[in-house]
From Swiss-Prot:
Residues 2-19 are annotated as: Required for interaction with PRKCI. GTP binds at G16, V17, G18, K19, S20, C21, T38, G64, N119, K120, D122, A150, K151. Prenylated. Prenylation is required for association with cellular membranes. It comes from Rattus norvegicus (Rat). The lineage of its organism: Eukaryota, Metazoa, Chordata, Craniata, Vertebrata. Mg(2+) binds at S20, T38, D61. A lipid is attached at C211, C212 (S-geranylgeranyl cysteine). It comes from the Eukaryota. The modification N-acetylalanine is found at A2. This is Ras-related protein Rab-2A. InterPro entries: P-loop_NTPase (IPR027417), Rab_GTPases_membrane_traffic (IPR050209), Small_GTP-bd (IPR005225), Small_GTPase (IPR001806). Residues 190-212 are annotated as: Disordered.
Amino acid sequence: MAYAYLFKYIIIGDTGVGKSCLLLQFTDKRFQPVHDLTMGVEFGARMITIDGKQIKLQIWDTAGQESFRSITRSYYRGAAGALLVYDITRRDTFNHLTTWLEDARQHSNSNMVIMLIGNKSDLESRREVKKEEGEAFAREHGLIFMETSAKTASNVEEAFINTAKEIYEKIQEGVFDINNEANGIKIGPQHAATNASHGGNQGGQQAGGGCC
């Protein structure tokens, strides 16, 4: 399917926070309770619609283990968006956010949009990190914030789409150089065939998709 833009994402965070499950829920709309550890990097893709334009999201799911950190770093450079994930039932994953964020900002382009995600919101009885703590961390570091559940699909769609909306807004504002693919944005065939509009940011519903 033709698209106006392709946005590259990277999903980062500690092992076991649900990165692969979030990707699977977004691309395939299913939950896999037992998931093998990601070894290196896995990949998924889906089409969405923003402001009447088809946007292809190309999403790289990275391993959380320290031994794979150098591989993860190489994917920061070509990403327009990052989903930084922690597990609300494991405080250590929240405590490690600063390290992940420093790594991301050191190795990515300065305009990369970062969405902070507190995953496993369905496990409220086991919560160790308050929602207010996530909100405060996001405010302090200039991030977008949502709590999600890869199991129930709560806010999963919104997390990926809202990140794309932020990227799209930056394109409209001229913040991103869309002719430089190192920024994680590629102009698609649909954009070339039509005049780019500079209207408001509307929509964001799925237009179909699948896992690649």
